[in-house]
Amino acid sequence: MLQTAAIMLVFLLAALRVHAQGNPFTQPTESELRVAIATMRADSRFPPKARIITTSLAEPSKKMWYDSSRRGTMPREIKATIFDASSGHVYEFTADVRSRSISEVKHISNAQPLLTKADYDSSEAIIRRWPRFNDAMKKLGISPADVSVETWASGIPSAPSQRMVRAIFYIKHANGVNRYDRPIEGMSALIDLTSRSVKEWREVPRPEVPNATATYMLPSKPEPPVKSGLPTPTMVNGEVQWNSWRFTPMIHAREGLTLYDIRFVEKGVARRIAWRISLSEMLVPYGDTAITWIWRNAFDVGEYGFGHSSAQLRKGADVPENTLLRSASFVDDDGTVVTKKDVLAVYERDAGIGYRHAASATNVSSRHARELVVQHAAAIANYDYIVSYIFALDGTITVDVGLTGLMLVKGASDTVYDEVGNSGQMYAHFVAPNVLAPTHQHFFSFRLDMDVDDTANVVTEMDLRSPPSGRENRYGNAIMTDEWDIRSEREGVRDVSVPLARTWRVRSKRTSAHGIPSAYTLVPGATALPFLSPQNYVRKRAQFIEHQLFVTRFSPSELYAAGAYPNQSEEGKGLPQYMENDDRLIRRDVVLWYTMGVNHLARPEDWPIMPTAHASFKLVPTGFFERNPIMETQGEMKKR
């Protein structure tokens, strides 16, 4: 017995490895996740047949982390969303992996968590057993075995006690390549996973099935790595340390790549910039009016999960040879811990001229620039999204989303382009014979928990304008800046203005020797306005697309722009709830929610696989430094 107990103790201590006084933001390990799930299942409140939907680090208290004297006492906790299919109940369990104890249990009412592999498998099994599906395929001369079933979130607010999904169908390819080019157009099913039944079947009289499109796949072997001559970045206990930058990246099951405790070291002091930055939510509304398309509006973060959809990144193909790759562990429905290999990439790359000036032909001062890229890719059904945070030597952070993969297309009778845009080409674009790509939009809501030098910040809106002719603009060339502080959450609902070159500055009470406030400026990038009508139920569920900026007061539980459970949600969740109290924002801990958008009007060049398109915005130091910080970085200043 004693020997067994000793072995168990050794195993437990080895398994935990839980950062006694280290970095609390590091990715949960396989061992920690196993301990957390075992602890939860041992609790009497854990439903016997419940599924694990997501697990994540229960983040440490911001106040405790900023108080360095208390860091050693912080718990290491794992939070899990639990779904009991037998009752339809949702729970949130939090377990302390050091003490192997349950810290908190919450019952979440009227909610449906994001979809998982078990839901996809159940959906396919239900529809394949349904006689009408099999009969419909046989009428088309298609063997049901040759049909691929694609499961979507239902796209509608519905009774939260019933777990609903949609199914659409494609013809399989013999080699498994590009199944999305042969949709069985006009057929779809609404499936109740709770009762395991088909609730609605849509079938047009003569579904269109396009012929196969030429394969897009190249040989899967990566190209030989090209030597960049740049070093591979390093991590110290999970923290990236590159030149003056310090931060910790983590892959969340839901949000994907999330950055913690972002700082810039100046004169030996690691100055705060942001506590947490992540992709909070997405919406992809499709503009086709066909009955099998009107519900296709994907909340990709909250309905499917960016982390669960992580794709492996390969040197020589996705990232350069000098990349530092890291894996991430997640938990499947049944509690099995699964590690996804090489899903986080960190690499340095050339960034061109950092600065340059030629005082004369023989007196040129210049510095070459580099930048650090932190990257994650999510393959969600047909689309691939690449989220990158790019850190520059001048203190700028660029947030970039790459959009690639395969377009979602529909089968059609059209064999040529219709210049007038009749029939199906009113709402979709001809990309190949019998293949139309519906017009759609992509909205990305980023949550930016800014802590510029302190947790007490002020957000200022900055506009440029040309004053009327007169004393202020006698010669017609004047450009003035208007600034006003956002005082409350309701005032913090703001829009991009191109005529006013609008930006937003987050400043602290710290000032330079000359009285300039220390600040970072949000410089907007890709912008799109929603084409969904104001009465559309999806638009009402996605209030974050109504404006480009929302400013709220920090609350650790307010993480998701469309709410914690957008699947089958009703209107008014997320940001509308967070702003209900209209909290004051002057000298408070503020969070910026910035939404950028992309309009996708399909081109033939987007088919059969899309070249990567990019949408981005920037966080730019504005008075944070007293002079150009590139001058202080490592590297030789070249003169001639």
Q: What are these model-predicted stretches?
A:
Residues 12, 47-49, 72, 141, ...:
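A generic structural signal for short, solvent-exposed coil/turn residues
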